[in-house]
Amino acid sequence: MKQPERGFTLLEVMLALAIFAALSLAASQVMNGVMRNDEASARKEARLAELQRGFSLMERDFSQIVPRRSQGYELGFYAERYQLSSADWAVSFIRNGWLNPLGIMPRSELQRVGYRLRGDTLERLFYDSSEPLSTQEPAVRPVLTGVTGFVLRFFGKDGWQERWDDPANLPQGIAIVVTLRDYGEITRIFLITPRYGAATQRRSER
């Protein structure tokens, strides 16, 4: 005798739908988690690239400090807190090595640059000459974001100092301490060669 065909009961259909919905939700959560991880990784990579570019730029500048009389500063170098409209320390100096291939541009390879903290951004100031006019405004380039502190220390014949008041000599070394909101305190130390103003870099992070 032929058995009557039997369809799905309402309970079985509802159970199947519930299982399908649960699986879909789980898959969606996994996908969202993967996307969030990818976004977080991309943000971290972008941040690390920003830090690398910023500290490389500072290394190029500080490694080419030269002693040169400028606008009342015997060596063209000064560093003070709250100068240059900075929220913390600021520094200004003359550097060599400003590229001028074949001397095409009507200028030397010397350039005045500076660093300051504005808001939470470490900025680089630069002029189109080593002797800018007093009324000339510098060009401004953001270097690092998320900065909560910018401190300078100076190494001289008496060791590390919190100020540099010797107008006749460059410091033998400069420590730059940058405090970041996400990575904390990072220190770069530049050793300045007295004769040429060239500097090499040492690094410490904590």
UniProtKB/Swiss-Prot annotation:
Assembly and oligomerization: Type II secretion is composed of four main components: the outer membrane complex, the inner membrane complex, the cytoplasmic secretion ATPase and the periplasm-spanning pseudopilus. Interacts with core component OutG.
Keyword Membrane: yes
Family: Belongs to the GSP J family.
PTM remark: Cleaved by prepilin peptidase.
Keywords: Cell inner membrane, Cell membrane, Membrane, Methylation, Protein transport, Transmembrane, Transmembrane helix, Transport
Residue numbers carrying N-methylphenylalanine: F8
Residues annotated as transmembrane: 8-28
Function statement: Component of the type II secretion system required for the energy-dependent secretion of extracellular factors such as proteases and toxins from the periplasm. Part of the pseudopilus tip complex that is critical for the recognition and binding of secretion substrates.
Record's protein name: Type II secretion system protein J
One CC-aspect GO term: plasma membrane
Naturally occurring in which organism (per UniProt): Dickeya chrysanthemi (Pectobacterium chrysanthemi)
Gene Ontology process terms (BP): protein secretion by the type II secretion system
Cysteine disulfide partners in this protein: none
Organism lineage: Bacteria, Pseudomonadati, Pseudomonadota, Gammaproteobacteria, Enterobacterales
Gene that encodes it: outJ
InterPro entries: N_methyl_site (IPR012902), Pilin-like (IPR045584), T2SS_protein-GspJ (IPR010055), T2SS_protein_J (IPR051621)
Propeptide feature ranges: 1-7
Topology of the protein relative to the lipid bilayer: Single-pass membrane protein
One Pfam family named in its UniProt record: N_methyl
